[in-house]
A protein has these predicted regions:
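N-terminal, charge-rich interaction modules
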Residues: 1-22
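Feature captures the catalytic cores and cofactor-binding loops of soluble hydro-lyases/lyases
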Residues: 23-24, 33-48, 52-117
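The Walker A/P-loop phosphate-binding site
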Residues: 30
Length: 117
């Protein structure tokens, strides 16, 4: 499913409108974790990350893991510095009012699978 369709279906708020190309990315896999070493080891390239972490290291990890997007659950919002870094690195950022469990469940219902599905 296209990232822009996921954002629309989940009612996500986009924080990085300057990132181009990702909205058309076909998202097949996702990962949820707040432990960044776990994300580095297991998140699927081209996928989405669902997390509560909102600091700069999330962007570094997302970029290194070649993630298309990060969804911040529970209405958690990074500051402007984090959004600026994401724009520079080409990582799309979104916010959901739903908690992590609900975001992941809705992603799965839309056809986004985990690494072992």
């Amino acid at each position: 499913m296209k990232l822009e369709d996921i954002a629309r279906e989940l009612g996500l708020t986009e924080l990085t409108p300057k990132v181009t190309g990702n909205s058309e990315a076909d998202i097949e896999r996702g990962y949820a974790s707040d432990l960044l070493s776990d994300v580095l080891a297991h998140a699927p390239a081209g996928g989405v990350l669902v997390t509560l972490q909102v600091h700069l290291n999330v962007i570094a990890v997302a970029s290194h893991a070649e993630l298309a997007a990060v969804i911040f659950a529970s209405d958690r919002r990074p500051d402007d510095e984090v959004c600026g870094k994401a724009n520079a690195e080409g990582v799309s950022l979104f916010v959901s009012p739903a908690d992590t469990f609900d975001v992941v469940g809705r992603l799965y219902a839309l056809g986004v699978k985990g690494n072992h599905a």
